[in-house]
């Protein structure tokens, strides 16, 4: 963490290079430094469960089939994803001792508030900014037990049992949030090298994928005598690199798959809402985005996946469940050209 002196220097430098007035009091600069620290603490606790969940949402449902397909076969899928929100990640506790400028308005020393994937409960935090009182309503969660969103996927079969995979979701508006994912990958059939497996309709495949997840949530709408602070939209940006192994067994028109998934995700956070009126005085959104780099993180996940795929002529219906820390399900209707 930056020292108090370093925080004030950062704010001062930003003021100088942005061409803004530098007539603000030392008290204002100190209070803004404290407010930035408080916002940073709350941001981490609030959005991290949602970005963890986004990894699960994007990680499952990549593999249609583990078997080797014919050259230039094309499959297009329309998918509906179901993410089951766990109780353990819906809320977190805050204490007055967690904050430097703010405190719980009710007079309590601690309170429980929702994460981004929690309920719609809210409390008020209060403090003084350069001697002027401010009052902040904590952000709501999405207040859903199951998060449902659609996405498209596709696969193109190339030479030697290799396929190119793609996944794309337009920006989907969920309750008080937005979600978007895109990604691509390569799958290679391994059972082609073991004739005994092919003879028994047992298939093996290895897959490597990359996906980008972007989740955004309504955040803190803070009104002050200096204008709106412009931190009312918080985004989590996640890059996920994934490897998985799948095995399947064919039973006439049914293919049953089981898989093991391992991935590494890089998490970044950014304020993406409209800049507030305070930007005429201090480039607060820029300063906060620089400070948000302090909570960037990298995490590894391991999960299992089971899937069933049923063929009706050129149409396939597939249901997939991935499980680990979270549970995520995907229902896909595919057409094979």
Predicted regions and their residues:
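Bacterial Sec-dependent N-terminal signal peptides
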Residues: 1-28
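Outer-membrane beta-barrel biogenesis signature
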Residues: 23-124, 199
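Transmembrane beta-strands of outer-membrane beta-barrel pores
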Residues: 80-84, 168-172, 190, 208-214, ...
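Residues on the lipid-exposed face of transmembrane beta-strands in outer-membrane beta-barrel proteins
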Residues: 65-67, 76-78, 152-158, 184-190, ...
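Extracellular/periplasm-exposed beta-strand and loop segments of Gram-negative cell-envelope proteins
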Residues: 89-91, 128-144, 173-179, 212-240, ...
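Repeated loop/turn-to-beta-strand initiation elements of outer-membrane beta-barrel proteins
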Residues: 160-164, 193-196, 253-256, 312-319, ...
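Residues that define the transmembrane beta-barrel architecture of outer-membrane proteins
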Residues: 70-72, 145-150, 178-184, 200, ...
